[in-house]
């Protein structure tokens, strides 16, 4: 058994007071990196956020449709993503430390942005930027953005083990996690993307979500 309890989405962010431009695709990102040479980077793979960013670069350049039914052949996949890999190689010289090394993880990159070493960052928490502005971690002029074609996202699931000793109780807990009330509270305190269908909520329930700033 499994059920969704939250969603996540890759976002990028910059400070509009320092960099008024907001790259909307890989081509604009390259020009952005050239203009702010040494001030752009991403977490080293296999960091979760860094990996998502690289996958997003791949999808933005070569699309994702061709991979749906592609045979599990490493060479075929490598050939398909080569244009994106070539782009990353072209991008490298303009990155922090000329792309020779990368921040070891997302929090390191985030601190570099806060300290002014970088003019751009990225996060897998869609509302994390807003939360960081609210608590003073980020400047009030920091803004989040996505590419025009969108960014990678996923749904998080909670599951019941096949050998669970109390399936009924686990279902009750899951139902509670999926309830509009708990989803709204998670949205408010954890800034996670809710899994509820907004169109099916009552007016009172909708107001609970609408009132979250």
Give the ranges of each region predicted by the language model.
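Extracytoplasmic/periplasmic substrate-binding proteins
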Residues: 96-163, 199-206
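Extracytoplasmic ligand-binding site segments that recognize negatively charged/polar headgroups
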Residues: 1-108
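Short secondary-structure boundary segments
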Residues: 43-44, 125-126, 190
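Hydrophobic packing residues within well-ordered alpha-helices of enzyme cores
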Residues: 54-57, 131-132, 186
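A conserved hydrophobic position in a structured secondary element of the catalytic/binding core
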Residues: 13, 123, 178
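Mature extracytoplasmic/periplasmic domains
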Residues: 151-152, 156-212
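Sec-exported extracytoplasmic/periplasmic mature domains
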Residues: 31-35, 58-62, 89, 93-96, ...
